[in-house]
C-alpha cells in the first residue's frame, strides 16, 4: 500500500443554503477533526452522536445519497463528499442544522470554495492508499459498473439518454485529482429531464429545486441559469456523484472505474464490492 499524511481543515467554515429536495434552509459547518476521525456528520455541534461517512450507513439512494445511524439522518451528501475526497481531506466534522445538505448552485463549487476558505492542514499520522488487486463488477439491467486495478484513480463514464436527444450519448474519462476535480468536475450542476418534474414532485422531491441550482433538459433545448458550463455537463456531473458515492468506501483507493448509466444505487453497490475486495486483499496480506 501507498501512504500519505492524513489531512484536515485548518479552520472552521460555514455556509447557509437550501436543500434541493426538501426545500429547507440549513446552516452547514465544517470543522477540523483529529487524526483517524474520518468524515463524520452530525445535526448539532453540541451532540456527540455522529454518522460516519461509510457505506454501512447508507439508507437511501433515491435521487441522492442518504446516511443514517441511530435515528439521525442526513441526505444529499454526495457533492460535499466528492469535494472532500478529491481534495484529500480525511478528517472533518460536518454539522448541518437540517436533514439535507444545502445544494448551492447544484454543483460542488460551493464546497470547493469552503475547503479553499478553510485551508488544508497535514497531520502527523498517515493514511494508507489501497490499490485494487483484481477487477470487480456490478450490473443491473442496462447499468454496468466495473473497477479495474490501476496506479491512479480514474473514472470513465458513458451516459446514454435515448429518450432525450438534447443529452443523447456522452462520454468522459478523467484521472481524478484535486486539479482535475477543480477544473473539470466541480462546476458541473445537477440536472433533470423536464418530463420528470411531475413525477419528482409527487415523490416529495425537488422542493428546493429551481433554475438556480439545477439544469432542466427538454427534448428541444435546455432550461438553465446561463449557458451550460460544458457541452457534456451532464456526464461530468455523473462523475461528480460517482466520486462522492465511492468515497463512502472509507479509505482512499486506486482503481480505474468504468460506468455505463449508473446512479446512486448502483454506485453504492459497486462501492460495496470494492470494499469487500480491499478487505479480502488486506486479510491475505495478514
From Swiss-Prot:
Its cofactor is Zn(2+). Pathway: Glycolipid biosynthesis; lipid IV(A) biosynthesis; lipid IV(A) from (3R)-3-hydroxytetradecanoyl-[acyl-carrier-protein] and UDP-N-acetyl-alpha-D-glucosamine: step 2/6. It catalyses: a UDP-3-O-[(3R)-3-hydroxyacyl]-N-acetyl-alpha-D-glucosamine + H2O = a UDP-3-O-[(3R)-3-hydroxyacyl]-alpha-D-glucosamine + acetate. This is UDP-3-O-acyl-N-acetylglucosamine deacetylase. GO terms for molecular function: metal ion binding; UDP-3-O-acyl-N-acetylglucosamine deacetylase activity. One of its GO terms (biological process) is lipid A biosynthetic process. Zn(2+) binds at residues 79, 237, 241. Belongs to the LpxC family. GO terms for cellular component: membrane. Keywords: Hydrolase, Lipid A biosynthesis, Lipid biosynthesis, Lipid metabolism, Metal-binding, Zinc. Its EC number is 3.5.1.108. It comes from Chlamydia trachomatis serovar L2 (strain ATCC VR-902B / DSM 19102 / 434/Bu). The active site is at residue 264. Catalyzes the hydrolysis of UDP-3-O-myristoyl-N-acetylglucosamine to form UDP-3-O-myristoylglucosamine and acetate, the committed step in lipid A biosynthesis.
Amino acid at each position: 500500500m501507498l501512504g500519505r499524511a492524513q489531512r484536515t481543515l485548518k479552520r472552521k467554515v460555514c455556509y447557509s443554503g437550501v436543500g434541493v429536495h426538501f426545500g429547507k434552509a440549513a446552516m452547514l459547518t465544517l470543522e477540523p477533526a483529529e487524526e483517524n476521525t474520518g468524515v463524520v456528520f452530525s445535526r448539532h455541534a453540541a451532540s456527540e452522536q455522529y454518522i460516519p461517512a461509510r457505506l454501512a450507513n447508507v439508507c437511501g439512494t433515491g435521487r441522492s445519497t442518504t446516511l443514517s445511524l441511530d435515528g439521525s439522518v442526513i441526505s444529499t451528501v454526495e457533492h460535499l463528499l466528492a469535494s472532500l475526497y478529491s481534495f484529500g481531506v480525511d478528517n472533518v466534522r460536518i454539522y448541518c442544522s437540517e436533514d439535507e445538505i444545502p445544494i448551492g448552485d447544484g454543483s460542488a463549487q460551493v464546497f470547493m470554495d469552503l475547503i479553499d476558505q478553510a485551508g488544508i492542514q497535514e497531520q502527523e499520522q498517515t493514511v494508507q492508499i489501497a490499490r485494487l488487486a483484481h477487477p470487480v463488477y456490478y450490473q443491473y439491467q442496462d447499468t454496468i459498473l466495473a473497477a479495474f486495478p490501476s496506479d491512479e484513480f480514474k473514472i470513465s463514464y458513458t451516459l446514454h439518454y435515448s429518450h432525450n436527444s438534447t443529452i443523447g450519448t456522452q462520454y468522459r474519462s478523467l484521472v481524478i485529482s484535486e486539479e482535475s476535480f477543480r477544473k473539470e468536475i466541480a462546476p458541473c450542476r445537477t440536472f433533470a429531464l423536464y418530463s420528470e418534474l411531475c413525477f419528482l414532485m409527487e415523490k416529495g422531491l425537488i422542493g428546493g429545486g429551481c433554475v438556480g441550482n439545477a439544469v432542466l433538459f427538454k427534448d428541444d433545448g435546455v432550461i438553465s441559469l446561463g449557458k451550460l458550463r460544458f457541452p457534456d455537463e451532464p456526464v461530468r456531473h455523473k462523475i461528480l456523484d460517482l466520486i462522492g458515492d465511492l468515497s463512502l468506501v472509507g479509505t482512499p483507493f486506486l482503481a480505474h472505474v468504468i460506468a455505463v448509466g449508473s446512479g446512486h444505487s448502483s454506485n453504492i453497490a459497486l462501492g460495496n464490492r470494492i470494499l469487500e475486495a480491499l478487505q479480502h486483499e488486506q486479510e491475505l496480506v495478514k
